[in-house]
Amino acid sequence: MDQPLQAQQGELNWRLSAHPITLLFFLGFRTSALLMYLFGVLFIKNFVLVFILTLLLLSADFYYLKNIAGRRLVGLRWWNEVNTATGDSHWVFESSDPATRTISATDKRFFWLSLYVTPALWIGLAVLAIVRLSSVIWLSLVAIALVLTITNTVAFSRCDRFSQASTYANRAFGGNIVNNLAGGLLGRLFK
């Protein structure tokens, strides 16, 4: 008798997610903006309404990814701070402590795959809008989508690199302190 295959962590199966509701909303916002852009005019005959709904879905996707999905699915968060005195702007990155939080391989895979695929799809739609030259307003909507999706992609990529670098630095720094303390104590005992 054949045994049914068991789903393993890391597969693209939302049921394996540690946070399935967060994951479904994340994927829902990501795909709904694309679907509204592609098929909205077929079902809603009002161009302005399709434009506004797509813009609202893009904004909801940006907010949800930045503030909720990134933190819950991969333990990363970012924001931009502006020094009011100088007007200088800098990005702040935050990551969960790997010792206290385990990230699901399925959540991680869905998150990063969707994070990189969505801007690629919008780039394809931008090329299509340029080639068609049917309406500049559609190109402006795609440009807004590209700004929002690429901003999140760049920010989370930097946040992940920052998180990995600080984890390695903490391990190296923490290991050296323990080695120095242990070496110093043992050296004093056997003097």
UniProtKB/Swiss-Prot annotation:
GO annotation, cellular component aspect: Golgi membrane
Membrane topology according to the record: Multi-pass membrane protein
Transmembrane segments: 16-36, 38-58, 110-130, 136-156
Record-linked InterPro entries: TVP23-like
Entry keywords, A to Z: Golgi apparatus, Membrane, Transmembrane, Transmembrane helix
Biological process, per Gene Ontology: protein secretion; vesicle-mediated transport
Localisation per UniProt entry: Golgi apparatus membrane
UniProt superkingdom: Eukaryota
Predominant subcellular localization, coarse grouping: Golgi
UniProt similarity note: Belongs to the TVP23 family.
PANTHER family: GOLGI APPARATUS MEMBRANE PROTEIN TVP23
Reported function: Golgi membrane protein involved in vesicular trafficking.
Protein name: Golgi apparatus membrane protein tvp23
Species: Aspergillus fumigatus (strain ATCC MYA-4609 / CBS 101355 / FGSC A1100 / Af293) (Neosartorya fumigata)
